[in-house]
Amino acid sequence: HCGMRFPSSTQPASEKIPRGRVMRIDETVPEKHYLRQNGRNDLEEQYQNHTRVVHYVSEGICTTAYALTQKGARNFLRTGGLHDSAMTVDMLLRQYCQMERGKTFHACLTVQPALFQQHHREGAKKADSNIADGGDEYRKKGVTDVVRWSLRMNWDTLLDGDTKFVDQYPDTYDPGMERR
């Protein structure tokens, strides 16, 4: 899901990727100023706080969570397992969904912001990734990016049957003002 964008006319095979979107207000989405993305932040620029958007996949990488129909799984396994087996799975999914390298159209949908994210534990940031250098920085508190009520941070609360969750991204707007 990393790098996911809304489909636009500047992307490969853009004329074949539908640009429709479904939006809904979702209290589990943090306010838009908390949303971090590399480059443009379409969510912050185009939608009000707490908006979750469902749309066709565009420019996604990483494989935190995916769901496929049985037919889609068979097609993906045929494509990835027989034809492009030297590629990483996340790049295979990207090509499969974006019709790159002569691929046919597949109805791949996603949500922004993502429903699942990696949890970064308290400690050395270099432990976060085997492909990115975290340097010597130290994280004082664990965080799950863009997930307001992180399962990892609320596990004990859930197991105890409580509903007083740790809110990583509490609302900061003035309730008397209209949400922007």
Describe every region a protein language model picked out.
Residues 2-180:
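An acidic/histidine-cluster motif and surrounding catalytic segment
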